[in-house]
């Protein structure tokens, strides 16, 4: 608790000077800016079987800096302090000429969409469960992105081991790629359809086992209701398909993800999948934007109110492989008000339904009301 309070004090001090503390060289070829965020979460849970306690917490704290130099170069160093633990987030250097971007460091692979969105930009308190289950954490590697009017292509090579994993033995590797096509693009209005894929080979420390897990659409619940432990793994394929539409005050995002594990001949291969769809409408002064290089929608801006809805199905059951990790359906509605470019407040309601193979109590239905106040700069 003492560590958390100290971090919050530092963050407040950080925020109070961040507007002025942008360092620039006299020639204008170097600029350094402080960045950070803090998320205050709270939730009330209603369950018929699992004892889910109401909770409040400081979910995420970030501190870092972004450095721009020599016109086209950028560096970023960001550390996380969630739950009083220090972790490495984005730590990379990149070169961009407007159409091409080369990035080296600790960052997300060019695969999937939802799980790569920053916590302060997520539409609900938690990412879509499908994204959590089959997305990937940041890894150490190199990636390249090319962007033009109708096309965005990314590819990368990464280590398959988390940077904080100290286990000995040869590391695995991952190859990933993402392709976006924009059939419609006029000013800030964009429609894109995309596909992505990832191939991974695990290192010696994993002992030929891959585990997929996810909980409810909330960061306040530690329980993993979905969990599939895939043994005798040889390698892993992941596939994704996505649609993003940004049309003035309307926003739509949908994604399908599938994980396929090739296993040794004595057992059947494993397949798990899921999809979600979410829609938003910006009230008051807001309208959505779109980042062409990342292929992500941006928030509607200060003094705006977002009304949101999401439906998600995640299935980790595979009878042929003999692995029943559970299936979850969840429905969420919510809203976000942006007081200014630094402070926002979120509120949402979620209804979750689990099948008989789910962990932590089997078949059940429960609901939750969650809120968040966030500061980011």
Enumerate the predicted regions with their spans.
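Outer membrane beta-barrel
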Residues: 21-163, 167-203, 281-287, 291-299, ...
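Bacterial Sec-dependent N-terminal signal peptides
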Residues: 1-22
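A short hydrophobic/aromatic micro-motif that marks alpha-helical segments and, especially, helix-coil
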Residues: 17, 86, 163, 261-263, ...
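Single-residue recognition of alpha-helix boundary sites
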Residues: 13-14, 116, 160, 259, ...
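Outer-membrane beta-barrel pore domains
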Residues: 49-50, 95, 208-377
């Amino acid at each position: 608790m003492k560590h958390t309070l100290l971090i919050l004090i530092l963050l407040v001090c950080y925020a109070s000077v961040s507007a002025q503390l942008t360092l620039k060289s006299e020639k204008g070829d170097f600029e350094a800016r402080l960045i950070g965020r803090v998320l205050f979460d709270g939730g009330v849970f209603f369950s018929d079987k699992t004892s889910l306690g109401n909770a409040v917490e400081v979910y995420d704290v970030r501190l870092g800096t972004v450095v721009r130099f020599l016109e086209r170069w950028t560096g970023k160093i960001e550390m996380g302090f969630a739950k009083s633990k220090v972790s490495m987030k984005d730590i990379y250097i990149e070169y961009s000429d407007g159409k091409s971007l080369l990035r080296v460091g600790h960052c997300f692979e060019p695969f999937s969409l939802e799980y790569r969105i920053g916590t302060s930009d997520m539409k609900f308190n938690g990412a879509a469960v499908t994204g959590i289950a089959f997305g990937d954490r940041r890894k150490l590697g190199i990636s390249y992105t090319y962007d033009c009017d109708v096309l965005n292509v990314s590819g990368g090579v990464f280590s398959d081991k988390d940077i904080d994993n100290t286990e000995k033995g040869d590391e695995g590797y991952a190859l990933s790629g993402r392709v976006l096509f924009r059939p419609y693009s006029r000013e800030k209005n964009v429609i894109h359809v995309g596909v992505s894929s990832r191939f991974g080979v695990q290192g010696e420390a994993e002992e030929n086992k891959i585990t997929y897990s996810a909980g409810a659409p909330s960061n306040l619940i530690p329980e993993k209701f979905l969990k599939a432990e895939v043994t005798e793994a040889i390698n892993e394929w992941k596939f994704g398909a996505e649609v993003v539409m940004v049309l003035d005050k309307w926003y739509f995002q949908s994604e399908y993800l599938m994980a396929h594990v090739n296993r040794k001949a004595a057992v059947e291969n494993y397949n798990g999948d899921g999809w979600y769809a979410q829609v938003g409408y910006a009230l008051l002064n807001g309208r959505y934007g779109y980042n062409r290089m990342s292929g992500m929608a941006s928030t509607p801006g200060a003094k705006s109110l977002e009304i949101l809805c999401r439906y998600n199905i995640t299935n980790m059951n595979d009878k042929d492989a003999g692995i029943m990790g559970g299936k979850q359906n969840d429905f969420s509605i919510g809203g976000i008000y942006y007081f200014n470019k630094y402070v926002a407040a979120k509120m949402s309601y979620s209804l979750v339904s689990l099948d008989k193979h789910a962990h932590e109590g089997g078949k059940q239905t429960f609901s939750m009301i969650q809120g968040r106040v966030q500061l980011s700069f």
